Amino acid sequence: MGVPALFRWLSNKYPKIISPVIEELPYEVNGEEIPVDITKPNPNGEEMDNLYLDMNGIVHPCTHPEGKPPPANEQEMMVEIFKYTDRVVNMVRPRKLLMIAVDGVAPRAKMNQQRARRFRSAQEAKEADEKKEEFRKMLAKQNGNKVDEELQEEVVKKTWDSNVITPGTPFMDILAASLRYWIAYKLNTDPAWEKLKIIISDATVPGEGEHKIMEFIRSQRAAPEHDPNTRHVIYGLDADLIMLGLATHEPHFRVLREDVFFQESRARTCHLCGQQGHKAEECRGQAKEKNGEFDEKQKGSSLKPFIWLHVSILREYLAAELYVPHQPFPFDLERALDDWVFMCFFVGNDFLPHLPSLDIRENGIDTLIAIWRDNIPVMGGYLTEDGHVDLKRAQLILQGLAKQEDAIFRRRRQAEERKLANEKRRKQEAKAREEERARKRRRSSPTYEPMDSPVGHRAPRGGGDAAPPNQLELITPSRGELSRQTRELTHSMVVNRGAVYRANMANKSAAAVLKSKLMQGSQNGQNGEEKSEGATTNNDEPSQDQPDQTEQTSPSVLGKRKADLVEEEDTDAGTPGRDSPAVPVAAKEDELPPDTVRLWEEGYADRYYEQKFGVDPQDKEFRHKVARAYAEGLAWVLLYYFQGCPSWTWYYPYHYAPFAADFVDIGDMEITFDKGVPFKPFEQLMGVLPASSNHAIPKVFHDLMSSPDSEIIDFYPEDFAVDLNGKKFAWQGVILLPFIDEKRLLAAMEKKYPLLTEDEKLRNSVGREVLLISEAHPLYQDLVANFYSKKQGVQKYKLNMRISDGLAGKVERNEAYIPHSSLPSSLEEYGMPSLEDDRSLTVNYEIPKSNHVHKSMLLRGVKFNPPALDNADIQAVKHKAQNSGRSYGGAPLRGGQKGGRINYASDRPNPFAAHLDPGFIPPVPGNVGGGPIMPSGWVPPIPGSAGFSRGPPPPPHGGMSGSHHRPPYGQGPGQYQGNHGQGDHYGQGQQGYYNQSSYYNQSNQYNGRSSDHGGSGGYRGGGGYHRGGNYRGGGYRDQRQYNQDQYSSRNSGGYGRY
């Protein structure tokens, strides 16, 4: 997904949304593996109903894994996919439904990003093969053409082209058939699957996998008999699954993913037997297995743990953060969540480049939230409604961002320069420490001679070999536990130190070159396509313009390794020997990348449009044209997330985004989309694959990609420009490929279609979802009686949700299926046998279509879990919300302070002006006395009175009495209760209110007091007067903020602070 590092940012800001998955693993008894019994209760303490697999997140890491050798062939790949999928199912244990969704043909808006990724992936695969060939020649030269056969085979082996994981290729056809076989096999052989319904949506069904899943969830919500308390789990590595989970408005929703930040050094240790890999409660008392002759080896764990991301807890956090005190319209959490999702689109998505002034690592989302909160009173309503954006209100948010853009760019540059200076300093200090350690080692050596010449260039006294070169890596064991690799190497060096020395001197050159090339490959983003489309291990997915992904080598990913160590390794060119070719030195790490636009200097907008778009910098109308296209894109993306694809043919026609200041009069735009039809699979292949991946495309189209006479040869450049766009590495830059002209492409392909074989025509067709159930499922007899009895029923059979256990939709007979026929297998040699009697049932499944708009609201009958956040969590979130978004690159604060409020409505009237007391004087920021200046005429309450210790005092008499004396948030009969749709399925009488007694005020969460005033928990003592009548309580500390919120819009200056 296009918000890079979103997962890391969310987990840092909202820590309680993450929890580890408790997983039971199979174990061995007397050499026999005992499988996990998933019919037992879920060890995570909560049963799950539906599991959805975004299958590309499984296919990519299984076909080209990181950290271990890839499967030898496609059969082994299928087995790895089965194992991984089985593990996910075992840990989730869905009780009702499993949906497997593979990416089909994507909307045109996504194809531009796919095209850039696949061109980059093919280029990197080609470079990897060239490096392997170069290394093979070097080994042959250094060893006199005597190279180990196994090593020779590994070097010569071509890099597997991950571009075949695209709809329409033979590989995807094999994947679809293999998945259907494996599901049927599980239904026949695994009792835990007997009551499970499985839906497979393979690559022949148009749409991205995660969006096909969302379409299914929306269709089930529209069914009258849908259970509103269905518990959903979706697996995938894309960060947008989090926002899609929010967009469903299903309160019981989790995202499952690998813990990509897991550190192997923190393996679990059992305190009973002392072995790693399990905890005490999982101990089976087995003897420790000896690894190595002296038990010097450590048995590493090959399985990464999984984690939950609880969307329900994220909803709680956002409920506190997005609530604006005294907003002039009812607070509606579901609408506010939609606005939050919409604002995330500005920071990055798969369809639009992010705005230049917004970066998630600079807390760009916080900046937008702060602007949104400030403008809520002015907008008079929310930004979005059921997937439709109000562009007039969006204009206000962009105007607010535009006022901060100059300061954001300047502060970004200052931060980059500080970071560079710190890196230089750390490197210099590390170098000085290393030199000092080297001097100490030389002094302690019996061969030490205090001479000016370097020790390494002299032979020691008494003859013998020369001292080893300084570049030779030495092992310095720490006091703590040595890593497995270090123990193995230490043991080897002790036993075979003589051989190690001779081998080291002979092979140092080859090792240095190999290491250098591998590190260069890592820098350049090897397997960039895989990481972005499923095999991501330590980062969230890159956006369309390939944003900075520094997390790829961050210390938290690499364990205890320091950032400067990583950089030193990345630039280490080794120590070439006599026969080694010179290794080019990497670009200097102590210099900022060249940036000719210079966003931090005056005139950056002119330079930006002149260099990036190639237009006259004075052409203001072009800037507005780009901004209008971007606004259209925002509307498209929002509809795509909340209602489904609004247009298969629309796309953003530029490589770069406009500035926030360029969005002028977008509120007057009328946006409509032509639905269109999706591409056929071969058309997408021709649109996204480079010519070097033509092996995945039918031969009849090859000449269109390679012949100089081809009418579309310009679509397939062998070399293409990469704009670093201020980044350090090429893989972070913007790939400048020509956009595909749909009409030209389809016209050229139309001439070749008659030459396709029957199998190729079948791969190019549009498929359907299939539903599989076992013979033991109650629905089995119902469907067999309709489709396979002597008196057959209707052709399209509408499912009875009581019999189907909550599944809505229609099914049709699958002509390729015959009841109780054999189930052939092409994987028998891998332990997947054929079955003589297939006792499962396969039918075509049709997702029900609804004529109604999917409403952004909770369904009637929802029952919430107990709140996960306590009052302290809520107050902390609210405090941050009121003081965030300024110190991360926005306009400077008055007096250099952090936080505070900013009014972006300098040219708009104060919406509260008619209600303010003319005699009121707002508090002065930074009051010397430490406490606020109280309103004139205000008198402290008498101890023991009704208003005593009840939060902040009331405003002056006659001032905002209407708003202050309303029942506080979470208190009072019916204030935030609503009817939740009584009398109608969608609860349209809800009016944006929430029953606090059932959710947000459970367990006295808000202490029965006004949540916008903070309650007793927010005042650090609950009122100072209760402590002897002095002013020590926390109430006055927050009163200043309360007054700021009440009167923040009085300031007429756009950068005023209160």
Curated annotation (Swiss-Prot):
Looking up InterPro entries in the UniProt record yields:
5_3_exoribonuclease (IPR027073), Xrn1_helical (IPR041412), Xrn1_N (IPR004859), Xrn2/3/4 (IPR017151), Znf_CCHC (IPR001878)
> Which GO molecular function entries does the Swiss-Prot or TrEMBL record give?
5'-3' RNA exonuclease activity; RNA binding; zinc ion binding
One GO cellular component, as annotated: nucleus
**Which chain positions lie within coiled-coil regions?**
407-443
Family annotation (Pfam families): XRN_M, XRN_N
Report residue spans for region: Disordered.
418-490, 520-588, 881-908, 935-1058
Ranges of Low complexity composition bias in the record:
991-1009, 1041-1050
Annotated GO biological processes are: DNA-templated transcription termination; mRNA processing; nuclear-transcribed mRNA catabolic process; positive regulation of chromosome segregation; rapid tRNA decay; rRNA processing
* Record field: transmembrane: none
Q: Where is the composition biased (Gly residues)?
A: 971-990, 1014-1034
What family is this? Answer: Belongs to the 5'-3' exonuclease family. XRN2/RAT1 subfamily.
Protein name as annotated: 5'-3' exoribonuclease 2
Q: Which organism does this record belong to?
A: Aspergillus fumigatus (strain ATCC MYA-4609 / CBS 101355 / FGSC A1100 / Af293)
